[in-house]
From Swiss-Prot:
Coiled coil: none
Organism taxonomic ancestry: Bacteria, Pseudomonadati, Pseudomonadota, Alphaproteobacteria, Hyphomicrobiales
Matches recorded under NCBIfam families: PRK03606.2-2, PRK13395.1
GO terms, biological process: allantoin catabolic process; purine nucleobase catabolic process
Protein name: Ureidoglycolate lyase
Catalytic reaction annotation: (S)-ureidoglycolate = urea + glyoxylate
Single GO term (MF): ureidoglycolate hydrolase activity
Sequence similarity: Belongs to the ureidoglycolate lyase family.
Subunit structure: Homodimer.
Keywords, in A-Z order: Lyase, Purine metabolism
Lineage top rank: taxon: Bacteria
Signal peptide: none
InterPro entries in the record: RmlC_Cupin_sf, UAH_cupin, Ureidogly_lyase, Ureidogly_lyase_bac, Ureidoglycolate_lyase_dom_sf
Names of required cofactors: Ni(2+)
Length: 166
């Protein structure tokens, strides 16, 4: 029997166990530069553990996913957080899972708007980038440095995601 995962809207409250939702709110804004710029302050705090580690910025260009889509694996980064902020203004899917004894529990799927990003905390199980509709660019804050910062898990039975309603 095929196990389809429910897609829910991305909210700060629902995503808290996994990391931060990166989005502007009136409470995050303050004026700088003589009132000419709105700064949305401290939306997330990237992590980079280990000697010689640092936070770097990258641009990832993701191909749109085809649906229904099979979730057969997840990954996590034990030494650093990883954030994805869309530059193309398009929605994307975010797939995360709680840890269950060193493996991912049942995945949860969130639909992020084109003006929302996410920061996965260290050690949070997640599925690779899932753009929708078209090729999409993302600004990614990631850890660079010595040590193995990637762990993958492959499910015995995959989960499925139906095409989201946008």
């Amino acid at each position: 029997m095929t196990d389809f995962l429910e897609i829910r809207p991305l909210t700060k409250e629902a995503f808290t166990p996994f990391g931060d939702v990166i989005e502007t709110t009136p409470s995050s804004m303050r004026h700088i530069n003589g009132g000419q710029t709105e700064r949305h302050h401290a939306l997330s705090a990237p992590e980079a553990a280990g000697e010689g580690a640092r936070i770097i910025l990258n641009i990832f260009r993701g191909q749109p996913r085809v649906f229904p889509h099979k979730i057969d694996m997840m990954e996590r980064h034990p030494l650093g957080s990883q954030s994805f902020s869309p530059l193309s203004g398009r929605p994307f899917l975010v797939v995360v899972a709680q840890d269950d004894g060193g493996r991912p529990a049942r995945p949860q799927v969130f639909l992020a708007r084109g003006d929302q990003g996410v920061n996965y905390r260290r050690n949070v199980w997640h599925y690779p980038l899932m753009p929708l509709q078209a090729v999409s660019d993302f600004l990614v804050a990631d850890r660079e440095g010595p040590g193995n910062n990637l762990e993958e898990y492959f499910f015995d039975e995959p989960f499925m995601i139906a095409e989201p309603s946008l």
